[in-house]
């Protein structure tokens, strides 16, 4: 029997390749059929190893979920970008490699991200979800999120609605 340890920690530059791989596989799984194909491919290609290295070294707060010493997921967090909403923090992204989804690891990473925001003086948090992403909506509603705002984003000429979920 093999015992795998899990750890959530701040990302290091040496994690960039693993995070880029998680980003690619999880985004393709999550957004194929939702985002226009070309837009999705361009967004994935833009987030290469060099991009993640810069993000980690600069001001972006990136947390990783390590399982058995390998990066299985990541979250990016920071200040709430919508000043008309009172929440102090925002989870910009939270993604896991597909083989780790549905096992409770996403919830663990999400709770750690929220705790990191609180500890950093950013109480309350927002998460924006595309309205067509049923799996993400189910995840955040099951985590206790309240639908507090709506917006839209345009990808390669296609406008998609998004929902903001609030967490205390």
PLM segments and residue spans:
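Conserved beta-strand-loop-alpha-helix junction that forms the acyl-donor binding cleft
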Residues: 127-137, 154-159
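Conserved active-site tyrosine of GNAT-family acetyltransferases
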Residues: 140, 145
């Amino acid at each position: 029997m093999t015992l795998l340890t899990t750890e959530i920690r701040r990302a290091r530059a040496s994690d960039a390749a693993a995070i880029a791989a998680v980003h690619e596989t999880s985004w393709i799984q999550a957004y194929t059929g939702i985002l226009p194909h070309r837009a999705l491919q361009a967004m994935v290609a833009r987030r290469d190893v060099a991009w993640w290295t810069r993000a980690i070294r600069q001001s972006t707060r990136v947390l990783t979920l390590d399982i058995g010493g390998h990066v299985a997921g990541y979250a990016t967090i920071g200040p709430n970008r919508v000043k008309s909403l009172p929440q102090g923090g925002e989870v910009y992204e939270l993604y896991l490699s597909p083989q780790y989804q549905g096992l409770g690891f996403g919830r663990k990473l999400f709770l750690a991200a929220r705790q990191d925001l609180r500890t950093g003086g950013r109480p309350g948090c927002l998460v924006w979800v595309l309205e067509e992403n049923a799996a993400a909506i189910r995840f955040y509603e099951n985590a206790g999120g309240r639908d507090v705002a709506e917006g839209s984003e345009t990808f390669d000429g296609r406008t998609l609605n998004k929902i903001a979920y609030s967490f205390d």
